[in-house]
């Protein structure tokens, strides 16, 4: 981790990552967004797509790396900066190191799987063949708020669905009793 003073340009790119994360949320995915920049220009963007694509590796960072590799026709993404709303997990940290991204800037720490200093730090591991500068905390509260609002809404939806399922089951049981039939209601 570094004690870095963020620039106005850093803030612009992180705000874009927050916007990109909204696309993930629209698709029912965890709202994490990533923007890869080279020489002050966005070369790729990615958002979480794991659920919809049935692909555990389709994290925002990986999606952005894949697009950049195709655009630049090279998996080595030298002299690039990745802005991501949530601290990279171990898988994404490994991909970022392997692709040689020079700088990673993340907003919110990942208290469960953060691999850039919160839980572990793969970027400072002696096992790493490549190194990257990692800076954290840029627009942290906005990134954190976006994720927390999503999970609060998701928990409420799950709770409501369970409540509806219980009511339907109770109605079916009452219906069975009233008709003196020994059958099980079909929940579909």
Predicted stretch roles:
Residues 50, 84, 108:
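Residues that line or immediately flank small-molecule/substrate-binding pockets and catalytic motifs
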Residues 58, 62, 66-99, 103:
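Helix-adjacent hinge/juxtasegments
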Residues 28-32, 78:
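Short, basic and Ser/Thr-rich N-terminal targeting/leader segments
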Residues 32-40:
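Short beta-strand scaffold segments in enzyme catalytic cores
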Residues 17, 21-24, 34, 44, ...:
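Small-residue (primarily alanine) positions within well-ordered alpha-helices
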Residues 1-24, 95-188:
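Zinc-dependent deaminase
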Residues 43-50:
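Short beta->alpha transition motifs characteristic of CBS
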Residues 4, 8, 12, 30-31, ...:
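Residues at secondary-structure transition points
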